[in-house]
Amino acid sequence: MSQIKTIAVIGTGVIGTGWIIRFLAHNKIVHAYDKDIKLKKNLIAEIKRAWPYSKKLFNKKKLNLKNFKYFTSIEEALSGVDFIQECATENYVLKTKLMNTIGKYAKLNAIISSSSSGLLLSLIHI
């Protein structure tokens, strides 16, 4: 993961927030995407709330929010990223549409990862 510098997290719910915190703890540049700008304030508050626990877990001293950017445009969020962590709702239609959109805007050598736990990848039609 040391070669990965910039990461996009698609979806800023509970799972996405957890990934964002982990990636920030490892000094990655994080592009968070959610279509609702109103969620940004709550997301930053949650990152700050969880940081004392993350400091202990990852042995980090300081949270660097300069590495954090919030986007409401998926195209902008995916621009130039090395790794994409998809964290959308568990729904085949939604995931299929989202993965096709990610494929459209991601750079060719970007790694695409999904936090799906109850869906079969073979049923997500890309």
Task: Pin down the residues of each PLM region.
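Short, flexible active-site loop motifs that bind/organize anionic cofactors or intermediates
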Residues: 5, 30, 67, 85, ...
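NAD(P)+-binding Rossmann beta1-loop-alpha1 motif at the extreme N-terminus of oxidoreductases
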Residues: 1-53
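A short beta-strand-to-loop transition that corresponds to the Sensor-1 phosphate-sensing loop
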Residues: 115-119
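Ligand-binding pocket scaffold of soluble enzyme catalytic domains
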Residues: 111, 121-122
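Rossmann-like NAD(P)-binding element
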Residues: 35, 53-111
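Conserved small/polar residues in nucleotide/adenosyl-binding loops
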Residues: 124-126
